[in-house]
Amino acid sequence: MRKSIILFIALLASGVCFAQSDTVRMQGSIGEVIVEGSRHHSDLRHTPLTVSIIPQTKIESRHNSSLLPTIAQQVPGLFVTSRGVMGYGVSTGAAGTMSLRGIGGSPTTGLLLTIDGVPQYMGLMGHPIADVCHSMMAESVEVLRGAGSVLYGSNAMGGVINIVTHKMKEDGVEDKIELSYGSFNTLQSAITNRFKRGKFSSSAGATYNRTDGHRANMGFEQIGGNLNLGYEFSAHWNIAANAQITHFNASNPGSLTAPIIDNDSRITRFASTLLLKNSYERTSGAINLFFNKGRHRINDGYSPEEQPLNYRFNSHDEMMGASAYQRFSLFNGNNITVGADYFHFGGKAWNRFLDNQPDKITADKAMDEIAAYCNLRQTFLQLLTLDAGIRLDHHSHAGTEWIPQMGLSVALPREMQLKAMVSKGFRFPTIKEMYMFPPQNPDLKAESIMNYELSLSQRLLDGKIYYGVNIYYINGKDMIRTLPVDGRPMNINTGKVENWGVEAMLEWNISQSWSIESNYSYLNMRYPVVAAPKHKLFAGVNFTHKRLHIASGAQYIAGLITQTSPLTEEKGFILWDASAEYNFTQRLQLFARVDNILNTKYQINAGYPMPGTTFMGGLRFRF
């Protein structure tokens, strides 16, 4: 570990260590950010919430078909598992597990993924599908660090990742084609169109990505698309509809010590929403109808010494519902939000036999969840903001939860901001945990945590420098664990959480050509879990001169547990990436990217070695 730290410091000292932090750069002023895509529309300087924002410029400069690698680099405390060049997969051997401050789980049921504020998760398993997070559809990404259950309910126990989709602000047409090719026969392609004329606007995109993978039998292929439509009835009312669809085929060769043959997945996901919004001087709100469904077909594979399986796992699931909220400002500095949510989720899972035996049903369940919430925020003299919220959430099987939240934000001299927050997070058990497979237990109750947080931030030199530090403590109970009961495995509410940590970030716009960025997180877990590193550091520099832009990032990871039985901790490692863009014309841009320049040998999923140095090059054409 000491050698890794010395090497990392050497990279910093030589000026070749580049990174991107979690704040938005706006015309040389950092930190003045409005949260646009969530139910909590506000200036971040007047809210006790800790929110990281990744803008479109950062997403595009990464040239990655998936949003998750970019998010994981730029947000302190957030970690996403990976197993190869492209694709995360599902089921056995899958990656894409997300954890924030040690909360998330495997699979990810304690961290909520949303698109334009609408939850996205598999109706039976209760977790998001990592491979639906396409970069092409994102205008920005907002990451709420810490419990967000008052506004978002179950699964927002550790935080919320909200993908804000593209919306044209001015009349015109924007078209873009991006094509790149690289190591291991990896292809990334995307085409997008954005249009606005008068009251009507639209955004559409399609993508195709594939790779052979850096190991045999680790191929991945994906096709997807999205469509957004909007219409402004008046200055106060507008309606929007959007849909996303993706299909991918993923293969898993198994770990090095336990290889698997023919472990292949065919997954199709579809999501749509219909949104009616209103906006007046003293009030604004929305009514949202949403629908999410999936079709999964999986061959669980077999080990070399076994015979092929005579069945295939099949499932179809759905998650649908409605949400409504309205914000009121009764007088200056006042903001009251009231809202309600309804979710219906479930599906059917079965094993289909190849010899025409009758299907074996493993689940055929549906459940409902209904909730109401209220959040009050009051700002006094632009100096002190008090925030308090409460949510009542009822699950048709697991019962009722009360969720409180309180916080304050204080504006100090010299543009310093002090914030304090106490919030409860929770998640209801999933249908899988209660009714599927041998560990199931229908008597499970909700997991819950309490999150205590203190933060300090400051802008210097007219906003050219921004830094922030967060200290937090998390205490949780009734975490669902699989343990032997009467000689058989069973899911029971027995686990505990006790985490504390520190997060820090720095961004400095030195000049129009140079900027430096960094973020760091330290996590101490009394009860260790996988995919939550103790140390996570990302630092760097960006350089722009005329038509040329160069960026790179070095990330140091240490204290990463890859499995708990037996307890296995990966040695500290450094990942150094670099990219360059050159604008030949206003329409044509060429780019290249190199990942893992140091050819570091490491694993994130136990038994799945990650690729060494990889290359990617391509072009972007705007017309």
Task: Show which residues each predicted segment covers.
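Surface-exposed extracellular loop regions of Gram-negative outer-membrane beta-barrel proteins
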Residues: 249-251, 295-297, 346-347, 351, ...
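Gram-negative outer-membrane beta-barrel transporters
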Residues: 379-381, 471-475, 492-560, 587-589, ...
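Flexible loop and strand-edge segments within Gram-negative outer membrane beta-barrel domains
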Residues: 211-218, 222, 236-319
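Short acidic/polar hinge/loop motifs at secondary-structure boundaries
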Residues: 118-145
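Short strand-turn segments of transmembrane beta-barrel domains in outer membranes
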Residues: 148, 160, 164-195, 204-206, ...
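Short, acidic, small-residue-rich periplasmic hinge/interaction motif at the N-terminus
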Residues: 20-60, 68
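Outer-membrane beta-barrel signature, preferentially recognizing the C-terminal barrel domain
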Residues: 256-279, 315, 365-367, 415-417, ...
